[in-house]
């Protein structure tokens, strides 16, 4: 306890001693400063009255002027009474700690490079801060100096803008005693802010605070809106580009498809040419076979004429007649099924010329579509190049190039679709025309040859046919694979199959008279129906009529004497299909007759042919349904009663003809017959 008391006494004594020394030192300073201060105050007052005489009697203004003078002294290092540019720059950098004092330097000097005390005072008086009210000073203290805790002190002292220079100088009495600022950092901060305000005017933050806030908000809104707009435009441009790329890919696929169709078209044309060559070879082969059949018929004719067996000749003639009838029946059916009308040769050339002219217009339309496709491709490539640049996406998004390219692509695609549809319709139409006319139209010698063949003025045709350039195609033509089939290529398999069938089918033998009558009635019905649709070619019908008009319908001796295979062969037309069927049947019938002649050599050479004819038509025939003609017995009696065989044969032949006519008119009275006209007897004019 004693130790603590002693320590407290020693501390108290030391404090009192230190306080006494400081008081004595301050008293001495006051005495010396009072004498020097009196002289400085007199000089300051005289200078202030010289500079601003109306305000020299105001104590507050004197204090403010003295503060401005002290600020000038701080800046004037060489003490020559003027502050030059270097001195002000050094003061701003060292005392005010401005790293880039360019703006402040220009504001302080303006156009005057030397600043005196008078210039500095006048600049202070013209400043906006000089006229600040108490509220404005307090606002400056809160917002700029950021010392709101001294607001009450400033309000009590009623400090206005006139007192600002006193705050800008180091004054312990003003800051410590009057303002009661105990914190040294607060005093230094207040001094620096006040010095900046006195020298350079009010701070910009205080003067334009709300405006800057508003501009900042507006800038933020504009920035956010711009970013959002850029994002929307970027997404829209990407979607548009994707759509355009899809259209472009579809256009490429259409081009490839059109190219494939063109290749298939060329391939089909090559097949057409091959089929045409095969057809020519087949016709040549059929003509050779016809010539062989003619030679064989001539040989059989000579053989039949040289035999002395009358009965075998009669039977041979009947078989020959049956085969000829069957061959003519088949030939007529073949005629009905394969030929109805033959167009003239000039029509083929005119149709070929029409096709070539249409191809010219089609090529022009196709070239226009290709040109539109090329323009669309170039536009797409330009957009791709623009997107690779820095602002390419924004430029593409704000310009109308995307819409233009999209429109060009759609236009090109529509043009390609029209070209494809025109190609499809043209192929189908000319295919049907070829089928109906029966000759080639698409494959032709060319427009120049056709113009020369038809004796047309070349100036009527205009420009020459453009060569088809690089052919393109749409997505819709893949269904045309089966449509590019030539009519001749479709007809040639049936032609070959029919020829093959005629070469391999078994030859018909001798049939019953009932079957022949039934077949005649059915073929006549079929012929009557088909004649209404397709008329028979005149040359083939005329040849068949001439061949059949030379024979009777029941095969009497008149056929043997007047009609023979050689004459029938000569009267038949040159059609390979019809003539081949006829001569194959004829050849087969003649072979059978020849074999029968060899099997029956016992018949006497002078035998009456009436016996053979009556035997072939008598009830003892192998077919029980064969009708017996009325004139058979008459022929037998006539042959027995007469001594001249030729007269008896002629008489029996006439009676047999009458009997056959009566049989055809009287048999089957309940059924209506439609006999073929080639089996009718020729009318005598």
From Swiss-Prot:
Q: Which GO terms describe its molecular function?
A: calcium channel regulator activity; calcium ion binding; channel activator activity; identical protein binding; ion channel regulator activity involved in G protein-coupled receptor signaling pathway; microtubule plus-end binding
Locate the EF-hand domain: which residues?
64-97, 102-126
Species whose genome carries this gene:
Mus musculus (Mouse)
The SAM domain extends over 132-200
Q: Which Gene3D superfamilies match?
A: 1.10.238.180, 1.10.287.3550, 1.20.5.340, Transcription Factor, Ets-1
Q: What is this protein called?
A: Stromal interaction molecule 1
Q: Which GO terms describe its biological process?
A: activation of store-operated calcium channel activity; detection of calcium ion; enamel mineralization; establishment of localization in cell; ligand-gated ion channel signaling pathway; monoatomic cation transport; myotube differentiation; phospholipase C-activating G protein-coupled acetylcholine receptor signaling pathway
Report residues binding Ca(2+). 76, 78, 80, 82, 87
Among InterPro entries, the record links this protein to:
SAM, SAM/pointed_sf, SOAR, STIM, STIM1_SAM
As given in the record, the signal peptide range reads 1-22
Instruction: Show the segment(s) annotated as SOAR/CAD.
Output: 344-442
- Extent of motif Microtubule tip localization signal: 642-645
């Amino acid at each position: 306890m004693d130790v603590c008391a002693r320590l407290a006494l020693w501390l108290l004594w030391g404090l009192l001693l230190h306080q006494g020394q400081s008081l004595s030192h301050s008293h001495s300073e006051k005495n010396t400063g009072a004498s020097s201060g009196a002289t400085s105050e007199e000089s300051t007052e005289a200078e202030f009255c010289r500079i601003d005489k109306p305000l020299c009697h105001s104590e507050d203004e004197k204090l403010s002027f003295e503060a401005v003078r002290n600020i000038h002294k701080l800046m004037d290092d060489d003490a020559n009474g003027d502050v030059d540019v270097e001195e002000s720059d050094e003061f701003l950098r060292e005392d005010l700690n401005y790293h880039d004092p360019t703006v402040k330097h220009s504001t302080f000097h303006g156009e005057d490079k030397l600043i005196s005390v008078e210039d500095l005072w006048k600049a202070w008086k013209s400043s906006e801060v000089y006229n600040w009210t108490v509220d404005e000073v307090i606002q400056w203290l809160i917002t700029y100096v950021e010392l709101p805790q001294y607001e009450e002190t400033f309000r009590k002292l009623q400090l206005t803008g006139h007192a600002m220079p006193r705050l800008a100088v180091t004054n312990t009495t003003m800051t410590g005693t009057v303002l009661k600022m105990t914190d040294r950092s607060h005093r230094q901060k207040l001094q620096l802010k006040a010095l900046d305000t006195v020298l350079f005017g009010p701070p910009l933050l205080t003067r334009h605070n709300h405006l800057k806030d508003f501009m900042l908000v507006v800038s933020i809104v504009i920035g956010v809106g711009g970013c959002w707009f850029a994002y929307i435009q970027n997404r829209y441009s990407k979607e548009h580009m994707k759509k355009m790329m899809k259209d472009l890919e579809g256009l490429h696929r259409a081009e490839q498809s059109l190219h494939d169709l063109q290749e298939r078209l060329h391939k089909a044309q090559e097949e057409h040419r091959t089929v045409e060559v095969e057809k020519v070879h087949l016709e040549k082969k059929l003509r050779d076979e016809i010539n062989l059949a003619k030679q064989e018929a001539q040989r059989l004719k000579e053989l039949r004429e040289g035999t002395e067996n009358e009965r075998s000749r009669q039977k041979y003639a009947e078989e020959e007649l049956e085969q000829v009838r069957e061959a003519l029946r088949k030939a007529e059916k073949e005629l009905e099924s394969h030929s109805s009308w033959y167009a003239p040769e000039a029509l083929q050339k005119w149709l070929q010329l029409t096709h070539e002219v249409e191809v010219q217009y089609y090529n022009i339309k196709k070239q226009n579509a290709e040109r539109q496709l090329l323009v669309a491709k170039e536009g797409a490539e330009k957009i791709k190049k623009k997107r690779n640049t820095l602002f390419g996406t924004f430029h593409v998004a704000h310009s109308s190039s995307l819409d233009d390219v999209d429109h060009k692509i759609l236009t090109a695609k529509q043009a390609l679709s029209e070209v494809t549809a025109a190609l499809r319709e043209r192929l189908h139409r000319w295919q049907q025309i070829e089928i109906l006319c029966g000759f080639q139209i698409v494959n032709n010698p060319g427009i120049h040859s056709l113009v020369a063949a038809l004796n047309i003025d070349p100036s009527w045709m205009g420009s020459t046919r453009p060569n088809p350039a690089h052919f393109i195609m749409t997505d819709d033509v893949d269904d045309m694979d089966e449509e590019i089939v030539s009519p001749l290529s479709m007809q040639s398999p049936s032609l070959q199959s029919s020829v093959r069938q005629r070469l391999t089918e078994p030859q018909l033998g001798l049939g019953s008279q009932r079957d022949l009558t039934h077949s005649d009635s059915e073929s006549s019905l079929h012929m009557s129906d088909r004649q209404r649709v397709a008329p028979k070619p005149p040359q083939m019908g005329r040849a068949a009529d001439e061949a059949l008009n030379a024979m009777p319908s029941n095969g009497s001796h008149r056929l043997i004497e007047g009609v023979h295979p050689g004459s029938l062969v000569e009267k038949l037309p040159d059609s390979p299909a019809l003539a081949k069927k006829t001569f194959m049947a004829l050849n087969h019938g003649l072979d059978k007759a020849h074999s029968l002649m060899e099997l029956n050599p016992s018949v006497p050479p002078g035998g009456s042919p009436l016996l053979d004819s009556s035997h072939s038509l008598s009830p003892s025939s192998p077919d029980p349904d064969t009708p017996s003609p009325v004139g058979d017995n008459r022929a037998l009696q006539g042959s027995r009663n007469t001594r001249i065989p030729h007269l008896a044969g002629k008489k029996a032949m006439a009676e047999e003809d009458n009997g056959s006519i009566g049989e055809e008119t009287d048999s089957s009275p309940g059924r209506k017959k439609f006999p073929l006209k080639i089996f009718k007897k020729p009318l005598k004019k």
